[in-house]
Structure formats: C-alpha cells, structure tokens
Regions:
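Glycan-recognition and catalytic regions of carbohydrate-active enzymes
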Residues: 49-66, 123-138, 152, 160-235
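Conserved alpha/beta catalytic core and glycan-binding cleft of carbohydrate-active enzymes
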Residues: 1-163
Length: 236
C-alpha cells in the first residue's frame, strides 16, 4: 500500500492467499492453514481481490484477519503469487512438491491459473518442468542444542498438521541437502519436457497478449459452477 494510503510503501507483497487457494483446490488438503481454503468461491475471491481473508474470520488464527484490497487503486503486479516456493515445500514433512501428488493435467491447470492471473507470478526452481526431486528443509547449525530444538519444533508442527513424523528427514544430515538438488537430466525426458513446453507457452502468451499483463484488478472477472471456473482479463 502507498504511504499516502497508510501503507509501508513497499514495491510488492507476498500473497500466500493465492497459494493457499490454488493448493487446497488442486490437492484437496484442508489441514492447518488450508482449512478456510479449497472452494471455487475462495479461488474467485483471490483472483479478483488478491486476498481471501479481508477482515473475515480465519479459523486457523481463531480471529478476524486481513482487510479488503482497493481494486480500483491497487495494481495486481504488487502481489507476488505462486504455486510453490521454498517455504511451502520446505515446510512440508518430507519436502514433497506438487508433482509428487498431482497429475500432469492438474499441474497444467495450476500453471494456467497462475500465469493468467493479474499478479506477479513467481516460479519455484524446477516447477516449470515438474521436477521430481523434493525440497527438504536443511540446516547447518554449529550449535547442537539449536539443531535439536529446530528438529523438535518441526515435528510438533507436522503433528499439528496431521502429518506423520516417522519419515521426516534430519535437517542437519548432509543427505537432506543432497536430496534437494535438482536433477537437470530429467528436463529432457517425458513428462518433464512437455511440462516445460507448457510453461514456455503460457509465459509467451502472458508477454504477448496485452490483457494478460494488465495490472488492473477492476478488469478481472471470474465465474464458476460446481466443477468449472472461467476468468476474463480485460477484453480476453
């Protein structure tokens, strides 16, 4: 928000609500902070207004949260949106990416919604080819007490999300870091090659179709039924 409107004058803001809406809808997960997300109504709200919680009740927080974005004044490019990032993947019990649980078809649905939305899209490393390698939380703390505290804290958080802690990798183990490295050779193989082509085409469309780079939230319209959603950007 601009300083003259009472904000901090930042260039852009991380938009977790877009991630939560897409993730919960695509995966069906409803635990933890996904509890209020996952419906097409929720998806429509974030695509047109950036946030779902706009002074509404957050069951995860146990209180009202957020405030309404002024769609006429605030451009969409000031919101950084994503399907995956280092936090959302690294803070899962085993660091599994969306590609571990979603079909290529559903991954393309998510990519299309992200890259045709009015926000600044951010891609996580390897997302563009549906990398099969995990992104596991790893550390190199020299203090044994800190390392143990971090590991114990993560296990408590995973238990609260309903995830099994039996297979949680040790953040301090070198193998946890090694497991998180990308396998660049798989880019050449199917289905990774085809997924990369999909992302490239979506990025090309975003760069060449003027309405897809129009930042005005007031020119975004979304309709949906029980099993479909449609988004209109300007004249598109």
């Amino acid at each position: 928000t601009p300083r003259e409107a009472g904000g901090m004058g930042l260039a852009a803001q991380w938009d977790d609500d877009v991630h939560h809406a897409l993730h919960a809808l695509l995966t069906g997960e409803r635990q933890g902070y996904y509890s209020d997300f996952g419906s097409l109504d929720c998806l429509a709200a974030v695509l047109t207004g950036a946030f779902y919680h706009a002074g509404t009740w957050s069951s995860f927080r146990g209180r009202r949260h957020g405030r309404t974005v002024d769609r006429a004044r605030m451009p969409g490019h000031r919101f950084v949106a994503f399907l995956q990032n280092h936090d959302q993947i690294g803070n899962r019990a085993v660091g599994d990416r969306l590609s571990a649980s979603l079909s290529p078809r559903m991954l393309r649905v998510g990519a299309t919604l992200l890259l045709t939305a009015p926000f600044t899209p951010m891609l996580f490393m390897g997302e563009e080819w549906a990398a099969s390698t995990p992104w596991q939380y790893f550390t190199s703390h020299p203090e044994p007490e800190l390392a143990a505290a971090v590991s114990a804290g993560r296990r408590r958080e995973f238990a609260a999300h309903g995830w099994s802690t039996d297979d949680v990798p040790d953040p301090q183990a070198p193998s946890t870091f090694e497991n998180s490295k990308l396998d660049w050779d798989e880019v050449k193989a199917s289905p990774h090659r085809e997924m990369l082509a999909t992302y490239r085409e979506l990025i090309r469309l975003r760069k060449t179709v003027p309405d897809l780079s129009d930042p005005r939230l007031s020119r975004v319209e979304v309709w949906h039924g029980d099993r479909h959603v449609a988004m209109r950007r300007g004249g598109c």
